[in-house]
């Protein structure tokens, strides 16, 4: 069984994760344009949940397409 996760960069599509990567993650942080563009959002697959840096928000999940882009409706 291989998991489907959404991946950035755009266009954001659900892609099959490589064997051994059984988590989808969403990582968000602010860059220099945060006030005008909002947070930078990175989506992808992982074998283990990425460690969170102090300025990041990281969430992980383990079901197909469970990491849609926060600003997009799951399609």
Swiss-Prot record:
It is found in: Secreted. Expressed by the venom gland. Disulfide bonds join 5-24, 17-45, 30-34, 49-60, 61-66. It holds the Pfam family Toxin_cobra-type. GO terms for molecular function: acetylcholine receptor inhibitor activity; ion channel regulator activity; toxin activity. Its main location: secreted. Monomer in solution, homodimer in crystal state. Belongs to the three-finger toxin family. Long-chain subfamily. Type II alpha-neurotoxin sub-subfamily. This is Alpha-elapitoxin-Bc2a.
